[in-house]
Amino acid sequence: MKRTSNWIAASIVVATCAVTLTATGSINADDTATTPTSEVASSEAGDDSASTPAAQPCPSTSAPVATEAPASSNDVGDGTVEAVEPLEIAVLSPDYAAQPAAKEAIDFFEAAAEAHGHTVTVVDTNSDNAAMNAEITTAVSQGVDAIVVAFGTPQEFGDGLADAVEADIPVFGLDTGGLAEGILVNVTTDNGFLGEQSAQAIIDEIGEGGTVAMIHFDPFEPVRLRAEAARALFEGNGIEVVEYIQGDPEDSTGFAAAAVGDLLAKYPAGELDAIWAGWDASALGAYQATLAADRTEILVTGVDGQAFAIAEVATGGNWIATVRQDWDTIATTELGLIEAYFAGEEPAETIVYVPAVVITAENACT
């Protein structure tokens, strides 16, 4: 069951391999759309001659289905967790509707948990981190067995987390923006790796020297860590970061498209080599802007490995890489930790990292 913080049911659909874009560059969440983003970007700009080929879906375009979680996954404990009674689990997030990656991870978790007989309620506070406190308190008052805080900035959830601790209700982090008192464990990806590998894809293409613009978001710790790692690698290779732009997660694609459009006017051909974006929804806006301006000499990279990103990377155009976070494994690992806890096994670590994969045109459809 899903609801927004005011109990209005959310209905959000994300395309599985190609998405369409609105005129402002935001994602049009229509899973029936088949028009590739590069085609749409070109036609919106009144230019059908963009040099990047239209994205073609990879051979399988069906939506991903969560694999059933083992009783204990990713070497959680000794791997012999006994079956637990069905649980009531509240999944609370400020980012379910706003971020495709959050939706994918939460949907995987919900599917895996329900396959194990648990009841899951998903609550979206619509980009409002502060509202998470009230939602955690509400979940506590409803007597749920466990709470999952997914994405968001848990340092802002202090009051709600305190209520959960007082009620002895365990709270688990699903790719949250770091740890906070009251969260037993956070299952995530090594964000330093994500930043370095997405930056390395650019370095491999342009070599030492050159110029890059970066779209980051410091308030969310995972993206901040990615950006710090990427910037350090760029600067270590003599690449100048000429623009360091704070993105907008509430309108990731539209904001990035507008910001990069301005950059392209500021930096004529030959003065900007690449754009690094800390998450795919922003990379999509940057990519769209380069297509619309016929500036496909500028490389783009993203992070998350969303289906729309992989579809574009597969074309061999100027969106050259994304780094795929394994949301399925992140979700099933989270479930394994929850079930282990209720079988009497405390998490051995406060952070569990799940490996990520660099996606380029060579492996995008494999």
Question: What is the predicted function of each stretch?
Answer:
Residues 2-13, 21-366:
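A residue-level marker of the well-folded mature domains of exported/periplasmic proteins
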